A protein has these predicted regions:
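Low-complexity, glycine- and small/polar-enriched segments
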Residues: 1-198
Length: 198
C-alpha cells in the first residue's frame, strides 16, 4: 500500500446578534456588534524522515476549510427619533503548509505534496428604525488573508517510479478549478476565498 500524511482543519464559527430599542416618549438608539476570528496553522509533512513505499503512492496533504457566519439584526422605535446600527467583522487568517523537509522519499507510484485552502465568510446585516427622524446603517468587514504553501527542501531526495494510476491535479481556474492528470512528483499549493456581505 501507499503512505499518507495528512492534516486538515474545518473550523466554523457562527454568531447571531439582535437588539430592540423602544422609547414611547423620546428617542431610541441601538447598536449590535459581532467579531469572529479564525487564525490556525495546518501542517502536514516529513522532516529528515525516510519514507519508502514499494507498493503505491506517497501523499502529503494539508487542507484548510474554515467558515465564518455572522447574522445581525437591529430594530429601534422612538416617538421623536430612532437610530439603529450594526457592525460585523470576520477574520480568517490560516496558514496551510505541506512539505518534505530533508530526508528521503521513495515511491513506486507517485509522490504528491499538496496544500489546499478554501475559506468562506458571510456577513448579513439588517436594521429598522422608526421615528419622526430615523437613521439606520450597517457595516460589514471581511478580512481574508490565508496562506497556502507546498514545497520540497532541506536537501531532500525524492524519487517517484510513476507506476499505477495518475494523480488528478488542479490545473487552472475558470469559474471553478479545472483538473488534469499527472504522474511522478507533484508539488501544488492552491487557495480559494469566498466572501459575501449583505
Amino acid at each position: 500500500g501507499g503512505i499518507a500524511v495528512s492534516a486538515s482543519d474545518t473550523s466554523a464559527i457562527s454568531a447571531a446578534s439582535a437588539q430592540v430599542n423602544v422609547a414611547v416618549k423620546g428617542g431610541a438608539a441601538g447598536l449590535s456588534v459581532a467579531y469572529l476570528d479564525i487564525d490556525n496553522s495546518i501542517l502536514a509533512g516529513s522532516q529528515g524522515a525516510t519514507l519508502d513505499s514499494s507498493g503505491g503512492d506517497i501523499a502529503i496533504d494539508a487542507r484548510s476549510r474554515s467558515t465564518n457566519l455572522i447574522v445581525i439584526a437591529g430594530v429601534s422605535y422612538g416617538t421623536f427619533g430612532a437610530g439603529a446600527g450594526n457592525a460585523g467583522s470576520s477574520l480568517i487568517n490560516n496558514t496551510s503548509v505541506a512539505r518534505i523537509d530533508g530526508g528521503s522519499v521513495d515511491a513506486a507510484g507517485n509522490v504528491s505534496v499538496v496544500s489546499d485552502s478554501k475559506d468562506v465568510s458571510t456577513i448579513t446585516l439588517g436594521t429598522v428604525s422608526v421615528g419622526a427622524v430615523a437613521l439606520g446603517g450597517g457595516v460589514g468587514v471581511d478580512l481574508l488573508g490565508s496562506t497556502s504553501e507546498a514545497w520540497i527542501g532541506g536537501g531532500a531526495r525524492v524519487s517517484a517510479g510513476a507506476g499505477g494510476a495518475a494523480l488528478s491535479v488542479r490545473d487552472d481556474w475558470n469559474n471553478g478549478w479545472t483538473t488534469d492528470s499527472h504522474k511522478g512528483v507533484v508539488v501544488l499549493a492552491t487557495s480559494e476565498v469566498s466572501f459575501t456581505s449583505v
